[in-house]
Amino acid sequence: MQKNTASEFMMTFVQEYLDGKRSRLDFDLDFSHYLMKHYAKMDRENPDLTECFNFYLAEEGFDQAEGLSDDRHRKLIQKQFNKFKAALRDGFF
């Protein structure tokens, strides 16, 4: 993946949350905003990668996290991020 891409921005955003550099409130408020803002550019850069990110992090992560405790929220996002990164490692993109 090229450096300084919209996809890289979104991956860094998620990783900062998982590393404790962003609060859950910040993550919850900003995730959808940033995804909408960067989605078109991500899709131009790599449509398959964008669809994978959207599936694992938005649909199966963020959208399923409502009502979870902070700890369970972070664990769910970590699990989904790991699945996304595994798809990257397996060379699907």
Residue ranges and their predicted role:
Residues M1-F93:
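Acidic, Ser/Pro/Thr-rich low-complexity regulatory regions
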